[in-house]
Amino acid sequence: MNKYLVPPPQANRTVTNLDLLINNLRGSSTPGAAEVDTRDILQRIVFILPTIKNPLNLDLVIKEIINSPRLLPPLIDLHDYQQLTDAFRATIKRKALVTDPTISFEAWLETCFQVITRFAGPGWKKLPLLAGLILADYDISADGPTLERKPGFPSKLKHLLKREFVTTFDQCLSIDTRNRSDATKWVPVLACISIAQVYSLLGDVAINYRRFLQVGLDLIFSNYGLEMGTALARLHAESGGDATTAGGLIGKKLKEPVVALLNTFAHIASSCIVHVDIDYIDRIQNKIILVCENQAETWRILTIESPTVMHHQESVQYLKWELFTLCIIMQGIANMLLTQKMNQFMYLQLAYKQLQALHSIYFIVDQMGSQFAAYDYVFFSAIDVLLSEYAPYIKNRGTIPPNKEFVAERLAANLAGTSNVGSHLPIDRSRVLFALNYYEQLVTVCHDSCVETIIYPMARSFLYPTSDIQQLKPLVEAAHSVILAGLAVPTNAVVNAKLIPEYMGGVLPLFPGVFSWNQFVLAIQSIVNTVSPPSEVFKTNQKLFRLVLDSLMKKCRDTPVGIPVPHSVTVSQEQEDIPPTQRAVVMLALINSLPYVDIRSFELWLQETWNMIEATPMLAENAPNKELAHAEHEFLVLEMWKMISGNIDQRLNDVAIRWWYKKNARVHGTL
């Protein structure tokens, strides 16, 4: 129920009440009587206006409302301004329900509209009433058909309302606002955001996009909104360190008019961006960067002073709201980058700046524990723009001029320079995680020097965790994703050849404990694929292939039979073909590696692998879980057959099939 539909004191339909309302609106009061609360005045408007029978009286009251020093003072509070919009909206909805013989609904609306349009004073005073009319029209239309036919807004009036609102809005923003109070300067934007929930202001009757963005962004970043990214720090300081008090203050902040409408503003702003010039968009992006950096720094300080703030529900909710707002606005910039032609320098710089902003607020995404669609869209769109600079060299990376500077690599160096790799603060870990996610995309196209001096060194820092594994797990997984992406690039052969021995030695101990079984198998397969003939790494150092297979074979021999895979590193139990034991996982990695072996030694490797499989039942006698050991044997036999009969080289397939049917015979030779 609307709060303004609660009857005010003495809310009957008398001339006395009408006079009383007018006195209230003018700020007059009976000598000795207490001043009437603004809410009571608004309630009287809701109950009295729909029952007025004389159009002249309605005309009078509307004029009094617009000129009221109580409702629309020069230093009006934005909350009071929003209340007036809500109250007038409720008034019109009530008028549509009033059955007493009064002025007809259409005549009542026409009178209100004419009084508002004729008002010659400041335009900002007209906007709450126009917004109330527009929102009420939406409410009445949205209610749908009822048993009692409700009157609706005439089509012509709908159009006139929208046109009058847009004209008034543009006039308000075109006037010099330097000597006006913050409230009266920003009131038009708040009104615009209010009705944008139900009316498109971007069509045939469109607002002034640039002015809306200019004043609107000032509003949402002001003390009425996000406070340039410092709101949380201020509210926690005011709470004196008490979590409950801080929660109450933040909850109140989230309900303030501007903050409550951030979602709507962000979508309007995102749609407006495509209509303004590039230089102005650049200024918008610069301001967003500053907000993001401020929020990151204040959150760092908060978490240092009180680590429990990481789990403070209201603080996290506020951060999510802020993230959503900033990403939706930047989504408009991303759309513009992907659809409009522009100077390449500005094109690349805007994408660079978008990633700068996302880098600062990635800690919020990390805090959420899941990706956010708008964030992902901006992130990958900006990366696409930066990597487009490599387009002329994609087919042959060897043609990249060694001294050519790329914006994407400048960002890579900047991220490395600002990352605190040794820090245990969650916000610092989030920054490193962002850098690794970016490097995973960049490593496939950039200079070898960037890979060797920036990307791989950063990833190396987290490849082999020795402690705090659960806390570091996202970083470990991201670091390995970077390396695996780099291993797949043929032109990284020299760098990869140097890395492989160390990397193989570091990967093998990660299962079990860090890697899930499928992560381990994937990592081994990627390494084998990188070092096997006829790869560029194999041409660089042919010994690496044998080193990798020998290391894997040793891991197979050293892994006991019948030990279950830890629950912490398994995948969903609904997935089929899950290896039953740790040894089955390691052996599976070896089996999957066999198709890369040279045909001259392929049969020997098949036999050696089969010997280890066939040894399983014997080894199971000493296993703690004999049933699991037998399941391991069955699994490995099946996987061996899948490999042999699967999609492998035809020549290898012929050798493997012949071997399979004579495998009980002795195969002569040594590995």
UniProtKB/Swiss-Prot annotation:
Query: How is this protein situated with respect to the membrane?
Result: Multi-pass membrane protein
InterPro entries according to UniProt: PEX8-like
Protein keywords: Membrane, Peroxisome, Peroxisome biogenesis, Transmembrane, Transmembrane helix
Q: Where in the cell is it found?
A: Peroxisome membrane
List membrane-spanning regions. 127-147, 187-207, 212-232, 258-278, 318-338, 372-392, 475-495, 504-524
Q: Name one GO cellular component term.
A: peroxisomal membrane
Its domain of life reads: Eukaryota
Q: Which GO terms describe its biological process?
A: peroxisome organization
Task: Specify where it is mainly localized.
Answer: membrane
- Cited function: Involved in peroxisome biosynthesis. Required for the import of a subset of matrix proteins into peroxisomes.
According to UniProt, the name of this protein is Peroxisomal membrane protein PEX17
Task: Give the organism the record lists.
Answer: Yarrowia lipolytica (strain CLIB 122 / E 150)
Annotated gene: PEX17
